[in-house]
A protein has these predicted regions:
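Intrinsic disorder/low-complexity segments
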Residues: 206, 216-223
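Basic, polyanion-binding surface patches
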Residues: 1-93, 97-199, 222-224
Length: 224
């Protein structure tokens, strides 16, 4: 199973790096987690250096969308058992240690074991708008790999659930993502069509963050 999470690593100077990532959880070992960051990436470098990470379970989709649109500054607090940082808005988190590495030229497999798990707030149920934002974020991470027509079709479908069920946080996150798409279309010189819900303009760094695997994108889920 793959769970969409927020992975926080830090370097030897204590600088935290926040990255949305799809974490693989083997059915036969629920205390084992496989993290697959692309090479090169900050997450990979930090994990190999520190041998630790924090996996955060979060229902605030602004964190996922924010990391893909140049908004990586989210409140953190110290981890409890390892030298690391926890997302302050996480519903729960798991602190892990690196056990072994299966190397790969593109995407190494980092096998980690849980050393501590804590719950912070109750999970209040599934929400279609949150799903829409997560799926849109994955599309954003693949802007340079997917035809714009397909992106438009997917966005039109995801917007249905968003418009019916979104709260303020989901609408804000959606707006950030739509702005990235519009900026990408403008950069490519293609007619934008009727992409909805654009938020405030963001920098070119934000667009780059959505299209480079080293800063937030992944080809199977979201990752960095």
């Amino acid at each position: 199973m793959i769970q969409e999470t927020i992975v926080i690593t830090q370097n030897s100077s204590g600088l935290a790096h926040i990255a949305p990532m799809g974490i693989h959880i083997p059915a036969e070992a629920q205390d084992e987690f496989i993290i697959l960051p692309f090479r090169p990436s900050t997450t990979l470098n930090n994990l190999l250096e520190s041998k630790t990470a924090v996996i955060n379970y979060c229902d605030d989709v602004r964190v996922f969308a924010g990391c893909l649109t140049g908004r990586r500054d989210w409140p953190l607090k110290p981890a409890e058992k390892i030298n690391g940082q926890v997302l302050a808005c996480a519903l729960a988190h798991t602190e892990v240690e690196l056990v072994r590495v299966e190397d790969d030229e593109t995407r190494p497999k980092l096998f980690c074991k849980a050393v501590h798990t804590a719950n912070h707030a109750p999970f209040k149920g599934f929400n279609r708008a949150q799903y829409s934002v997560l799926e849109a974020a994955i599309l954003i991470s693949r802007l340079n790999m997917i035809p714009l027509e397909k992106i438009q079709t997917e966005i039109d479908y995801l917007r249905i659930g968003l418009e019916k069920t979104a709260g303020d946080r989901e609408l804000e996150a959606w707006g950030w993502l739509m702005t990235v798409i519009e900026n990408h279309i403008a950069k490519e010189g293609v007619y934008a069509g009727n992409l909805p819900g654009a938020g405030s303009a963001i920098s070119k760094e934000g667009v780059n963050a959505a299209s480079q695997s080293g800063t937030g994108a992944a080809k199977a889920g979201i990752g960095s």
